[in-house]
Structures are given as structure tokens and as C-alpha cells.
Regions:
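A short Gly-Trp-Pro
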Residues: 1-8, 13-121
């Protein structure tokens, strides 16, 4: 069942909310940036994401095919989310850093299915 989660970066400069169901699955990728940042994500459709604060502190980083906008806080360095637009994933989406969800319960994290993606190919 979808639930509204609130999230933020470490310093609070970025604040967002999103509608997601962690039971539908999360993922971890082995591409270079996800490996180095230990990014554990949940994908959220564009209409289910709201940036509440922080557009002015977001820094965009892209590499490789420039398919994903990796967004970091310019103050604390936290990678809070990514933005992509891929037909195979249903169009525009937000990749939410699970670690940035402020009101997620430990039980929800323990029960969330994790898919491992091969992002190195």
C-alpha cells in the first residue's frame, strides 16, 4: 500500500515528500556512482514526488550516457535523489535515496524487497 514519506538531506536544505510502497521493491545498482555512494533506491513516478525545499541547493552530476541526473546537496554533499526519463521504466521518475527517508520504519526497510541491478554493463 502506498504511503506518504518525507525525506531530507543531512543538513535539511533539501526536503521532499513522495508516495511509494516499499513492498513493491527497492534496488541497488553496481554502477560506479551507486557503488561508491552505497545508493539504495526506490523509484517514484514524477506525479508522486514533491520537492518541498532546496531547489537552490541541488547540484546536478551526470556521467556516461547522461541518462540520470544525480542530485546532491551543495551544503552537506548528500545524494538525496536522482531523476531520469526512460521509456522502459514508464517515463519520468525519481530515484529516492532510502537513507534520506525521515519517517520510514526499520521494519519497513527490513521487509522491503531488494533487486540488484547490473549497472556496469
Amino acid at each position: 500500500m502506498k504511503k506518504t514519506y518525507h525525506g531530507s538531506c543531512h543538513c535539511g536544505g533539501i526536503r521532499f515528500e513522495c508516495e511509494l510502497d516499499l513492498a513493491e521493491g527497492t534496488s541497488k545498482c553496481n554502477c560506479s556512482i551507486c557503488t561508491k555512494t552505497r545508493f539504495w533506491k526506490a523509484l517514484v513516478k514524477a506525479e508522486a514526488f514533491r520537492l518541498l525545499e532546496g531547489e537552490y541547493v541541488l547540484v546536478d552530476y551526470q556521467f556516461g550516457a547522461n541518462a540520470i541526473h544525480h542530485l546532491f546537496c551543495s551544503r552537506c554533499g548528500m545524494k538525496a535523489l536522482g531523476i531520469g526519463d526512460m521509456e522502459e521504466l514508464g517515463g519520468k521518475f525519481y530515484a529516492i535515496n532510502i537513507a534520506c527517508l525521515d519517517d520510514v520504519m526499520e521494519e519497513e526497510l527490513a521487509q522491503a524487497p531488494v533487486t540488484y541491478e547490473d549497472g556496469r554493463k
